[in-house]
Design a protein with these regions (language model features):
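Conserved Nudix-box catalytic region and its N-terminal flanking loop in Nudix hydrolases
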Residues: 21, 28, 32-34, 96-136, ...
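Unchanged
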Residues: 120-144, 151-205
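Short hydrophobic alpha-helical segments used for membrane anchoring or interfacial signaling
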Residues: 90-92
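Nudix hydrolase/Nudix homology domain
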Residues: 3, 7, 15-33, 110, ...
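Short amphipathic alpha-helical interaction segments
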Residues: 30-46
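Conserved beta-strand and immediately adjacent loop positions that scaffold enzyme active sites
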Residues: 86, 98, 187
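Acidic, metal-coordinating catalytic segment for phosphate/diphosphate chemistry
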Residues: 56-86
Length: 230
């Protein structure tokens, strides 16, 4: 969960961005009592964002990373798009291609269908994330080929932006392992193209998936979706 920071604490972090080593009097730019200000300064030290040495305050490495995401004029932490992987597995069964689809059984988008996916963890590269997520969500391994990056904006019908995600899309072939039909987050189903096209509430249509998987070059696409519920 994102760390919640009080406006007074953001003010302190902003000062330390531009004044790497500052004393108490240098940081107190807001009109509050010394006790009140000291409380917020101690909270930043407790959270590991600020360090005090010889009566001088400075940002820790964690504090620098956190404060660097700040809009210093608006005095707020900027929200950024999430980075994830999308994993579309295919196989031949009786001479026909089948696609592995995941029915999501958790919020948001409960009941929707799409490819396996997962967030890229801190310090993890997309390919390692793809292999880990696919193994955890399906029990399978396979050959992973990066096909493109798709940037999704999901909007509510009233115009509110609900999600902003960048997906590294991998095609997964030659799958093997102990297939898991059900996992805590949903169900995994191998289906034909005809059945895929009949699915409702899909994150990407079959034609959109095929456009990426069949591309001869690495693609970058921006796509927007408007939904009734989230």
């Amino acid at each position: 969960m994102e760390l919640k920071i009080h406006d007074f604490q953001l003010s302190i972090l902003r000062e330390l961005l531009f004044r790497p080593n500052a004393r108490f009097r240098d940081l107190k730019k807001v009109d509050i009592t010394n006790d009140h200000f000291t409380f917020h300064l101690k909270q930043l030290v407790k959270e590991g964002l600020v360090i005090k040495q010889n009566k001088v305050y400075s940002l820790t490495d964690e504090g620098k990373e956190f404060a660097n995401r700040m809009d210093t004029e608006a005095l707020r932490i900027e929200r950024q798009g999430k980075i994830a992987v999308g994993l579309h597995a295919v196989r031949l069964r009786n001479g026909k291609t089948e696609h592995l689809v995941h029915q999501r059984l958790k919020e948001p988008f409960y009941g929707w269908y799409g490819s396996q996916s997962g967030k890229v963890r801190w310090g993890e590269n997309p390919l390692d994330c793809a292999k880990r997520e696919f193994r955890e969500e399906t029990g399978l391994t396979g050959k992973f080929t990066l096909k493109g990056i798709v940037h999704y904006h999901h909007f509510h019908q009233d115009g509110r932006l609900l999600e902003d995600k960048y997906f590294w899309i991998y095609k997964v072939e030659n799958t093997k392992g102990d297939f898991m039909e059900e996992v805590p987050e949903g169900k995994n189903i191998w289906i034909s193209e005809a059945k895929y096209r009949k699915l409702k509430n899909v994150f990407a249509t079959f034609d959109e998936v095929r456009e990426v998987l069949n591309s001869k070059k690495l693609l970058y696409l921006d796509r927007a979706r408007f939904v009734k519920s989230y």
